[in-house]
Amino acid sequence: MHATNSARLFERAGNVIPGGVNSPVRAFGSVGGTPRFIREASGYTLTDVDGNNYVDLVSSWGPMILGHAHPAVVEAVREAALGGLSFGAPTEGEVALAEEIVARVAPVEKVRLVNSGTEATMSAVRLARGFTGRTKIIKFSGCYHGHVDALLADAGSGLATFGLPTSPGVTGAQAEDTIVVRYNDLDAVAAAFAANPGAIACVITEAAAGNMGAVAPLPGFNEGLRRLTREHGALLIMDEVMTGFRVSASGWYGIDNVAGDLYTFGKVMSGGLPAAAFGGRADIMGHLAPDGPVYQAGTLSGNPVAVAAGLASLRAADAEVYAKLGRNATALGDLMTQALTAEGVEHRVQYAGTLVSVFFTENTVTNYDEAKAAQTWRFPAFFHALLSRGVYPPPSAFEAWFVSAALDDRAFSIIADAMPHAAKAAAAAVKP
């Protein structure tokens, strides 16, 4: 399996695109080697520009729960595109998508469509500040909420991949208003409220963490956040960009029934096109322009083609799709466990709903510090052994693995053949 054409494209891209990619994790920076440039995809298969096929375990970082080029989604996009690509005016489709989201997540009474998860979290935090009249926010170490200045402090995802505590360009004033505490630590949250009486506008959390690897909230954690925010007059923002409509038809809310005040969504609700949303209680959402004083806008928000893709994806994701996602996540985790156990490699396979991760440690990982303490130096060898045998996992030890309902017996046969080689490579890896 060679990557000659990918290497040429990567070099060419580096002349005109910073780092040769448009999102840092795609550069293979933490695993080394040549990032694969993808030509096309169908079902569970990615095909790169060198003609190599891979079983996709990234799913475009979450959106593709049905697999790639699903007929219902492709037809919806084709039909919408024939009717026009963008109008800068309201459409029936955006109403239908908002209605679908509201119907699925009970605490969400109104929704505003945007273009990315970053826009959604940025807007939700601004709205929380505008609604409460407060400025400070609490976020959790290792939780990633997009590249919003105020939310980049000690974030997961790409920042974790590259070992960055924050980003240059984030001002001291912005950082001062962001209080970072340890995930799954209610005592730390309570202490932050006690130290900042009447100043905290919101707590923003991934409903289940997926950007330090898959780390589910400990029993009672989300419930505790709900209690503390109510006690202190702050809002609770549940970031479900990753978990929303993937871990269940109602997202993580469908698992623990803990009601946030505001929610952010993306990925699955986009059908693979640029679309996201934030929503919540009607009285809070009523503070948004044009009804209220908190400004938010977007030229392409509610784009008719993206809305059509998202609506088709949600409607095609029936009960059997969610059941299959669960089976596929478990099957993937079992294959990792069997292979790594056979090689005597310390590891822990973890799930956050149907998000999957492997940590090279014998301990359960419950927060970012524990994720970083794992033997992450084993991951590059593990990754490349899979990639060279036709399996495409996330190119970072700190990202969740995303299965799709398109994975079938043939796909799992390929994974099963590759996994023992990956386990051997992980076992043979040498700490730098």
From Swiss-Prot:
GO terms for cellular component: cytoplasm. The modification N6-(pyridoxal phosphate)lysine is found at residue 267. Its EC number is 5.4.3.8. One of its GO terms (molecular function) is pyridoxal phosphate binding. InterPro entries: 4pyrrol_synth_GluAld_NH2Trfase (IPR004639), Aminotrans_3 (IPR005814), Aminotrans_3_PPA_site (IPR049704), PyrdxlP-dep_Trfase (IPR015424), PyrdxlP-dep_Trfase_major (IPR015421), PyrdxlP-dep_Trfase_small (IPR015422). It catalyses: (S)-4-amino-5-oxopentanoate = 5-aminolevulinate. Coiled coil: none annotated. Its main location: cytoplasm. Pathway: Porphyrin-containing compound metabolism; protoporphyrin-IX biosynthesis; 5-aminolevulinate from L-glutamyl-tRNA(Glu): step 2/2. Gene3D superfamilies: Aspartate Aminotransferase, domain 1 (3.90.1150.10), Type I PLP-dependent aspartate aminotransferase-like (Major domain) (3.40.640.10). Keywords: Cytoplasm, Isomerase, Porphyrin biosynthesis, Pyridoxal phosphate. Belongs to the class-III pyridoxal-phosphate-dependent aminotransferase family. HemL subfamily. Homodimer. This is Glutamate-1-semialdehyde 2,1-aminomutase. It comes from Rhodococcus erythropolis (strain PR4 / NBRC 100887).
